[in-house]
Amino acid sequence: MQRREILQLTSGAAITLLLPTKSVWAQNTGAPPPGPQVPLAANAPWRQAGQMDGDWRTKALSYALLAPNPHNLQPWIADLRVPEQITFLYDTARALPMTDPMGRQLLIGCGCFLELLELAANEANIAIDISVFPAGEPSEKKLNDQPIAIVKRATRTAKADPLFAQILRRRSTKTPYDVARPLPERTPQELALAMQRSAQQGLRLGVVSAQSDTNLLASLRDLTWDAWLVEFVTQRTWKETVDLMRIGSDEVIANPDGVSLGSPFFDQLKKAGQINREGMLDTNSPGNKMAQQRYEALLKATPAMVWISSSSNSRTAQLETGRAYARVALAATAQGLCMQPVSQALQEFPEMAASFNKDRKSVV
């Protein structure tokens, strides 16, 4: 039987590295880089990325685990038992059966992980070859525990990509944006260049702003807000999110995965007994009414939107979409722009599909 030990690369636990004699575990809290609104311990992954010596794989993985992913579940396992190789698997214990029943969003997150992994390896002039789904694509209905990808070090050298420098700066920004600030004229072109490889594989980028099409932008704002409400008022999907909330700095540090609510504001609410999971399950509670108002303001204050579409919904296309999204987000960061993924309208649970199948096809 394989012996399993825990070695903390960063703070917490969410990427399992399988080695001949031990397992190594590390986690991205989903919190932004160090700042006054989050506990310092929760930012360890950003502060410690790339700090380990020795194996290039663990160094590259320390950046890959900062990848954006649904509900910050970080559903990845990296098997390092073969020298100079990473066998990348999906952790089937980390699933979102209510909001992501087919595992599409989680697989997109795995694509983000692979893109950051390659950027980090290339930064050290190490080229890698990535073979996806070596055992074949999983069912369109459910992911399995077969390898998502085999990553091998190549004999050639690689050139560093400027987007690597944005990995530690990128974050999903969940605050209202500045609607008065126009989208820089060069942005659509820069984002398209960032996902040039993905475009060759059938993916397309769309960008809309107040300058380019106010009607389409307004339609997308309404669509994202209405979809957020569907997920919120559907009891089982909202409960899935509430169960994954880490309320207060103590929970964020103890379990640095899931949806982080760690800041002095939430610490005070928790200490005063004004916020807890039971209360958050009541969608009509005063606190949740405030949350609705906050998210409506956030989504309606969106000066531009970007989307990625594929010619198929294959598992390979989903994985490549994640790689494209990671690059687009890093390219936006390089221009001083912030992004937040709002993909509720694409979720496959019945209530969402019934409400949005027609509308989302006509909008985009």
Label each PLM-derived region with a short phrase.
Residues 2-364:
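Acidic, surface-exposed loops and disordered segments
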